[in-house]
């Protein structure tokens, strides 16, 4: 009987305080032809950590695209309000990115591959519906630290839709 009560209390506490989110960046998918998936886990009501993975599907010759072909971004968010539906947050992130950068050598244009790591910050806002629907938008920038072949700045822009469970 004690085990049953313990299991029921654990299940009810998990449902009462949803701590996990899965999201898809719809702006990237529609505008830039890339897929960015994110997972976020709450440490407290005011802080969370997560990871997002960006896969660029646009061709290298496309004028409007991210420089990065692939980017994995672990992040930490601090929420400045404890409102249950609308939250404003600040984010620190580390972006591990790789792609191709266009260069000119001896009057020839070529693409040079790179892999680099960026540190950056972002700000944003999140809406949480009572049923678990999540909509968040954020904007930020990071700076690549290690490679001389990589772009200096890395954008962090998104409009996500997802589910809290």
Language-model features: locations:
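Positively charged n-region of N-terminal signal peptides that target proteins for export
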Residues: 1-4, 19
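Sec-dependent N-terminal signal peptides
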Residues: 3-13
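Sec/Tat signal peptide C-region and signal peptidase I cleavage site
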Residues: 14-18
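Solvent-exposed loop/turn segments connecting transmembrane beta-strands
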Residues: 23-36, 60-67, 84, 145-154
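Gram-negative (and chloroplast) outer-membrane scaffold detector with strong preference
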Residues: 40-137
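Outer-membrane beta-barrel "beta-signal"
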Residues: 153-165
